[in-house]
Amino acid sequence: MNSTPPPERRARQTVTHDWNPIEPVGIHDVQIQEVKNVIYSRGVLTEIYRQEWFKDHFTVRHVTLVHLLPGETSQWHRHHEQKDIIFPVGGFIRIGIYDGRVDSVSFGKSIVQTFNPSRPRFVYVPPGIWHSLRNIGPEQASYIVLNDTEYNYENPDDWVLPPNSTAIPVKLD
């Protein structure tokens, strides 16, 4: 029997005492912000959008509700002009973000974050940022996408790669 204790290390701090994240997002112009659930006598209210939350001007022009089946992953996609706000509202969603903008100070950097409605947050995605979402839970997952431009059916500002593309060095599994 081995009497040597297993190697250990102290966990690093990831949030402050009031549960704000320690580390910044790390990708230039991408914003991830927690919003508060407001519990009241008839249930829970969660604000999804306030203009003052955004440093860039963002006028909502189009809104979609997306449902992902368990284990499914959206295509990697980005926009040349359009800005997105992604707000998960149901289930467990892992969001991958990759900066493919060659002129960006954070070119080549990526982040992966997990979202669920118990601790609501949104992601602001500026033009040129690749993003994909994966349902990592056992039930359908849902998210709302707010766009600053209306969807152009004839000429969409959507540039896509398959979920498993090797061009994006991010894994959502």
Task: For the regions a language model picked out, list residue spans one by one.
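Beta-rich strand-turn-strand
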Residues: R119-Y124, I129-G137
